[in-house]
């Protein structure tokens, strides 16, 4: 079906009401990101009668995730006394939108600021919306910074500050839907390049800042809420979780989350992958590929996407293409070829386009889909591998604690 687009002049997204913007330090618990059972317990704890909690949870779930409210006064079918009780104890506010950049190709990048937690400081992350023919994809971050230091990735130069919470992951989706007019009875802003009909956000990918599987429980919780049929209702087939290769959590992700899997591969032998993706030293290719072969539900209808950044003179030879085919033999897969997106201080060059096409032809002739990802948002540093915020670094001991917890399960 043909999709038309809106090319009206650009205007920056603003928070709808100033009292919906998060302050520097939050004093109230947010209802965003709680499971339905957790929400029921939270309501009981503030005095909502137990016999009412299931009904109240259903009401709140609908208003938060279907209607997209960010102010308790907008909830029309809950009495004023209970709304006041909710306001006194909880928050459903959005994070602060520090900035919005809009690429010439329609890609949008938001810089979001979340309030301080415990003794920390407010942190900032980036979220990207990519409009395409017939769909809109939102790229979500799972951590502030990253611990993996992949040599071709800008995020890897920002050492990990902390994990995001389920609330903060879902808030990225809610803010984007606010800004795009993707909730009922909302208006799409001037300048938004989006499909005129249907949802503005049809797909989400966990491919922003951070390694999702180093924040497993939180990412799991957020994605299960995002895919809940009574709320945001995104199909699990339209949710993709990308990992650089945290092997112990790959099969578990398939069993407990059940979304589509993408693997940041980028090399066909350990020597090179150790340099490009240092987690390979801990989980080498043999272990990674074995985990992929055992991903639950793997089939031609549920293929794994292998991401392969094209680096000139590094990993782009036709011999590399042939070795890639052998490496993935027998795995239902799609291979996304990603032209390298430069960033300040990067030491790599993108492969020549003709070489990328030759590489793609070799892979395609072996029976694998090998689309070349068209760079989107390069001019605003919103393309793959270009995300970074200026938040404070986590102490080394904190980073090691996160890695140790995963590696010793």
From Swiss-Prot:
GO biological process: rRNA base methylation; tRNA methylation
GO terms for MF: 4 iron, 4 sulfur cluster binding; metal ion binding; rRNA (adenine(2503)-C2-)-methyltransferase activity; rRNA binding; tRNA (adenine(37)-C2)-methyltransferase activity; tRNA binding
The protein, known as: Dual-specificity RNA methyltransferase RlmN
Classification lineage: Bacteria, Pseudomonadati, Pseudomonadota, Alphaproteobacteria, Hyphomicrobiales
Disulphide-bridged cysteine pairs: 139-384
Top EC category: transferase
Additional comment: Reaction proceeds by a ping-pong mechanism involving intermediate methylation of a conserved cysteine residue.
Any single Pfam family the record assigns to this protein: RlmN_N
Biological source species: Bartonella quintana (strain Toulouse)
Domain Radical SAM core: 132-373
Ligand binding (S-adenosyl-L-methionine): 210-211, 242, 264-266, 341
Cofactor: [4Fe-4S] cluster
Family stated for the protein in its record: Belongs to the radical SAM superfamily. RlmN family.
Gene3D superfamilies: 1.10.150.530, Aldolase class I
EC number: 2.1.1.192
Cofactor details (free text): Binds 1 [4Fe-4S] cluster. The cluster is coordinated with 3 cysteines and an exchangeable S-adenosyl-L-methionine.
Keyword list, A-Z: 4Fe-4S, Cytoplasm, Disulfide bond, Iron, Iron-sulfur, Metal-binding, Methyltransferase, rRNA processing, S-adenosyl-L-methionine, Transferase, tRNA processing
GO cellular-component term (any): cytoplasm
Catalytic machinery residues: 126, 384
PANTHER family in the record: 23S RRNA METHYLTRANSFERASE, RADICAL SAM CORE DOMAIN-CONTAINING PROTEIN
Residues involved in [4Fe-4S] cluster binding: 146, 150, 153
């Amino acid at each position: 079906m043909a999709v038309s687009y809106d090319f009206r002049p650009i205007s920056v997204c603003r928070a709808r009401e100033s009292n919906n913007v998060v302050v520097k330090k939050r004093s109230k618990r947010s209802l965003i990101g709680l499971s339905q059972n957790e929400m029921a317990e939270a309501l009981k704890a503030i005095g909502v009668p137990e016999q009412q909690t299931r009904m109240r949870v259903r009401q709140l779930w609908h208003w938060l995730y279907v209607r997209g409210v960010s102010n308790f006064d907008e909830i029309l079918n809950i009495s004023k006394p209970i709304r006041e009780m909710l306001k006194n104890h909880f928050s459903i506010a959005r994070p602060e939108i520090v900035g919005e950049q809009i690429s010439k190709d329609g890609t949008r990048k938001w810089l979001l600021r979340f309030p301080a937690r415990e003794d920390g400081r407010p942190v900032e992350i980036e979220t990207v919306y990519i409009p395409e023919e017939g769909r809109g994809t939102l790229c979500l971050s799972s951590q502030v910074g990253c611990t993996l230091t992949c040599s071709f990735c800008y995020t890897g130069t920002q050492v990990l500050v902390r994990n995001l919470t389920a609330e903060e992951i879902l808030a990225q989706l809610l803010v984007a839907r606010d800004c795009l007019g993707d909730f009922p009875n909302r208006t799409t802003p001037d300048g938004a390049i989006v499909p005129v009909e249907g949802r503005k956000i049809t797909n989400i990918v966990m491919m922003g800042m951070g390694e999702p599987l180093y924040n497993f429980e939180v990412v799991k919780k957020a994605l299960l809420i995002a895919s809940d049929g009574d709320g945001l209702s995104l199909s699990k087939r339209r949710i993709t979780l990308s990992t650089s290769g945290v092997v112990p959590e790959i099969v578990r992700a398939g069993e407990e989350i059940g979304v589509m899997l993408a693997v940041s591969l980028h090399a066909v032998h350990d020597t090179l992958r150790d340099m490009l993706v240092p987690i390979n030293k801990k989980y080498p290719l043999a272990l990674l590929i074995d985990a992929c072969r055992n991903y639950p539900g793997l089939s031609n209808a549920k293929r794994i996407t292998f991401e392969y950044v094209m680096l000139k003179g590094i990993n782009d030879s036709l011999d590399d293409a042939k070795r890639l085919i052998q490496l993935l033999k027998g795995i239902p897969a799609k291979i996304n070829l990603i032209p390298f997106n430069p960033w300040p201080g990067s030491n790599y060059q993108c492969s020549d386009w003709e070489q990328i096409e030759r590489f793609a032809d070799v892979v395609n002739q072996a029976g694998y889909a090998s689309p070349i990802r068209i760079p989107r948002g390069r001019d605003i540093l919103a393309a793959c591998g270009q995300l970074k915020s200026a938040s404070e670094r986590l102490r080394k001991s904190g980073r090691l604690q996160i890695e140790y917890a995963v590696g010793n399960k």
